[in-house]
Amino acid sequence: MARVTVEDCVDKVENRFELVLLAGHRARQISQGVPITVDRDNDKNPVVALREIADETLSPDDLKEDLIHSLQKHVEVDEPEAAPAQIANAAEEIAEGIAEAGEEDVVTFDRMSEEELLAGIEGLVAPEKNDGF
């Protein structure tokens, strides 16, 4: 029965490798409890999945999309992008905020030569040795 079913499915899904992926995915769905769309006739889940594809009770495109979705680790949600005018306005506001920043907002760092750094390191006291650690 499975041989005839595979031959029937090749008309619906032309690539045999893709057919194996789709039927395997559908068989896993059936084993997880998703209702079947054809009579079981005492067949195992992979054969039922092939029969569903052959009888076109399931769309191969929908099954393929579901397979891809199940394999994705990160599903992107398409969000509407901001209009270019909104982006330009936001950039101008940020630039104005930076220009208006006062002197007290600017962070300065002390400069130190290599010799001063080495002298500072030599002046450090080693921590006491602890028996517990």
Curated annotation (Swiss-Prot):
Top-level taxon of origin: Bacteria
Chemical reaction(s) catalysed: RNA(n) + a ribonucleoside 5'-triphosphate = RNA(n+1) + diphosphate
Gene Ontology CC annotations of this record: DNA-directed RNA polymerase complex
Gene Ontology annotations of biological process type: DNA-templated transcription
InterPro entries per record: DNA-dir_RNA_pol_omega (IPR003716), Pol_omega/Rpo6/RPB6 (IPR006110), RPB6/omega-like_sf (IPR036161)
EC code: 2.7.7.6
Molecular function per GO: DNA binding; DNA-directed RNA polymerase activity
Keywords: DNA-directed RNA polymerase, Nucleotidyltransferase, Transcription, Transferase
SMART domains, alphabetized: RNA_pol_Rpb6
Family: Belongs to the RNA polymerase subunit omega family.
Function: Promotes RNA polymerase assembly. Latches the N- and C-terminal regions of the beta' subunit thereby facilitating its interaction with the beta and alpha subunits.
Quaternary structure (record): The RNAP catalytic core consists of 2 alpha, 1 beta, 1 beta' and 1 omega subunit. When a sigma factor is associated with the core the holoenzyme is formed, which can initiate transcription.
UniProt name for this protein: DNA-directed RNA polymerase subunit omega
Organism: Brucella canis (strain ATCC 23365 / NCTC 10854 / RM-666)
